[in-house]
C-alpha cells in the first residue's frame, strides 16, 4: 500500500477516527484551530512530502467554518509537497444550491464550492450520496460519489423485525432512490407520496400512491433537514393504516425545529449515518439510531490509493 496519510478537521473527528482504525493507520498530526480574531489556523506537524493524503471533513454546520478548514488544510498540505490530496467529504454542504430555479437571480453555490476546492489543489474528491449526482460535473477533478444504501439496507434486513415491509419515497424526486432500495430488499413493494398544493394559500395535500395498510413503511431519503415534511409524510401513512413507519437517510442535517418534529409519534424510528455528528438535543430523543459508514469509506480510500475500481464496490 502506498504511503497513506489521513488528516481531519473539526467537523467529523469521530468518523475520521473510525476510518483510520479500519485502515490500521493513525490520524495525521495537524493543528486545526482558531487565531484570537477567529481566523482559521492550520499547521501540519509531520512530513507529508510525496504522500498520498486524504483529508476527512464533512462540510456540515457550521458549514462555512468547516469548508474553510478543509480549504486551508488543502493549501497547507499542497505547500508541504504532498504527492496527492483527496478531499473526503462524507456530507457535501451547499449541494442543494445546484441550479437556478426559473432563472432566479441566485448563485449556483455548489459550483462555486467545486471551483474553490479545485483551485486550491485538490486532486480528487470522495463524497457520499450527493444531493444531486450532476454536481460531479461541476468539478475539474475526478469525483467518486459512493452510496450509503448498502449499509442502510443491511440494517433493514438484519436489525429490524419488519412485517410485510414497503419502501416509500417521500416525493416524486426520490423515486429512483426508493426503487433501488426496494430492489435490494428482495424487490419489495413501493409506494410514493405525491405532495400537491391545490391553489395558493391552501394547505399542501399528500396523496399516497400504493397500498400501505397494515404494513411497515420504510421512508427513504438522502438527507433529513428540519424533518417537517418527513413527519407529515409519516402522519399521512399512519392515517392510511400503516402499522409502523421507519425513516432511513444517509445525512442527518437536523436543522431548525428538527428535534421537535422528530419527536412526533408518527415516526417509530429514524436511522441515519455518521456523515454528520448528532447534536445533544437530537441524541436526547432516543429515537435516532446511527450507523457508521467508516467501513465503506475506508474501503473506498484503500481502493483510490491502490488505483482500484470504486464502482466494483456496488456491483
From Swiss-Prot:
| Job of this protein | Involved in the biosynthesis of the central metabolite phospho-alpha-D-ribosyl-1-pyrophosphate (PRPP) via the transfer of pyrophosphoryl group from ATP to 1-hydroxyl of ribose-5-phosphate (Rib-5-P).
List ligand-binding residues for Mg(2+) 1.
131
Metal-binding as a keyword of this entry, yes or no, is yes
Give the top-level enzyme category.
transferase
State what protein this is by name.
Answer: Ribose-phosphate pyrophosphokinase
Which sites are catalytic? 195
Q: What is its EC number?
A: 2.7.6.1
Question: Pfam families, per this entry?
Answer: Pribosyl_synth (PF14572), Pribosyltran_N (PF13793)
| Cofactor note as given | Binds 2 Mg(2+) ions per subunit.
Give binding positions for ATP.
37-39, 96-97
Q: Name one GO molecular function term.
A: kinase activity
Oligomeric and partner information: Homohexamer.
Which residues bind D-ribose 5-phosphate per the record? 197, 221, 225-229
Q: What reaction gets catalysed by this protein? A: D-ribose 5-phosphate + ATP = 5-phospho-alpha-D-ribose 1-diphosphate + AMP + H(+)
Q: Where in the cell is it found?
A: Cytoplasm
Which InterPro entries has this protein been placed in? PRib_PP_synth_CS (IPR000842), Pribosyltran_N (IPR029099), PRibTrfase_dom (IPR000836), PRTase-like (IPR029057), Rib-P_diPkinase (IPR005946), Rib-P_diPkinase_bac (IPR037515)
Required co-factor(s) are: Mg(2+)
Family listed: Belongs to the ribose-phosphate pyrophosphokinase family. Class I subfamily.
Tell me the SUPFAM superfamilies matching this sequence: PRTase-like (SSF53271)
Transmembrane ranges, per UniProt, are none
**What gene does the UniProt entry assign to this protein?**
prs
Q: Which Gene3D superfamilies match?
A: 3.40.50.2020
Which keywords does this Swiss-Prot/TrEMBL entry list?
Answer: ATP-binding, Cytoplasm, Kinase, Magnesium, Metal-binding, Nucleotide biosynthesis, Nucleotide-binding, Transferase
Query: Which pathway?
Result: Metabolic intermediate biosynthesis; 5-phospho-alpha-D-ribose 1-diphosphate biosynthesis; 5-phospho-alpha-D-ribose 1-diphosphate from D-ribose 5-phosphate (route I): step 1/1
* GO CC annotations, alphabetized: cytoplasm; ribose phosphate diphosphokinase complex
Q: Which GO terms describe its biological process?
A: 5-phosphoribose 1-diphosphate biosynthetic process; purine nucleotide biosynthetic process; ribonucleoside monophosphate biosynthetic process
